[in-house]
């Protein structure tokens, strides 16, 4: 997979990054396909020299399927090359760990009834698309019977071993007495 990412340069404690197009399997500072910009985090945000990007080349690579890393996506969003990515803030991370665990324990029992209600609500939704798909499947008559017969044949096979396993489990208990 092709990535648009930062490649670190500079000396100790003085980072300077190149914005590069690279294969995701390569090392962070390893071989890259093309350099499309630079980023100097030591400069103030309002300085023009902080970020330099080749917008046309970046748009080309995005069109080719290159995926920007989260940091590069923010830089590209701030410079108007792509839409600004959603803010990945996690407000629960600011709460001390002990308090989060207490809240998690209290929330878990409340979530259980909701989880049970959700599958029941989804079941009618699943049946409706199948009913709509059936008339469309009747047009090609040869394919529809094969498709309908296969799921029907699989269902009894799955139920039969369960039914056989239960009597087998009860039989050894009776013999032991």
From Swiss-Prot:
Residues 107-122 have a biased composition (Low complexity). It holds the Pfam family Ribosomal_S16. The keyword RNA-binding does not apply. The keyword Ribosomal protein applies. Residues 80-177 are annotated as: Disordered. InterPro entries: Ribosomal_bS16, Ribosomal_bS16_dom_sf. One of its GO terms (cellular component) is cytoplasm. Keywords: Ribonucleoprotein, Ribosomal protein. GO terms for molecular function: structural constituent of ribosome. GO terms for biological process: translation. Belongs to the bacterial ribosomal protein bS16 family. HAMAP family: Ribosomal_bS16. This is Small ribosomal subunit protein bS16. It comes from Pelagibacter ubique (strain HTCC1062). The gene is rpsP.
